[in-house]
Amino acid sequence: MYSGEMTMVILLLIGLVAQSNLIAICASVLLIVQFSKMDFLFPYLETHGLELGLLFLLLSILVPIATDRVTTRDLLYNVSSLPGFLSIVGGILATHLNSEGLKLMQIDPSIIFGLIVGSVIGIIFFNGQPVGPLMAAGVAALFIEVLNWFH
């Protein structure tokens, strides 16, 4: 078994132990792709996987607006209120951190394992909610940047 396959098996086990279905399913899918000799899909998944994931995430977020569970009036109130304004600022900061996290993962793809382990620890011990490695990478990039200020 190659190191990539072994890493996927370890991630599968971590996902199962931590009851993180996303990690377990992703590791399983990648193992199936590898073992079924459909590894020609890897470049496509690597290139477009993030876009597809964000597409489905955005679709799920916009459903309440599309189904009128959140009205235009609600949207206008939330944009003009202090919590709404702070949400906008939070969105700006989060997207910037995500961008930095994406750069970090492109520069050093091996960091993903640490991000997943950290996410699992957060789930198990801090009742955290996994939303994906991109934000974790953004926070890690911020920490690395702060550390670089002192070196």
Swiss-Prot record:
Record's bilayer topology term: Multi-pass membrane protein
Subcellular location: Cell membrane
Protein name: UPF0756 membrane protein Dred_1676
Main location: membrane
GO annotation, cellular component aspect: plasma membrane
Residues annotated as transmembrane: 9-29, 47-67, 75-95, 111-131
Entry similarity comment: Belongs to the UPF0756 family.
Superkingdom of origin: Bacteria
UniProt KW keywords: Cell membrane, Membrane, Transmembrane, Transmembrane helix
Any matching Pfam family: DUF441
Species per Swiss-Prot/TrEMBL record: Desulforamulus reducens (strain ATCC BAA-1160 / DSM 100696 / MI-1)
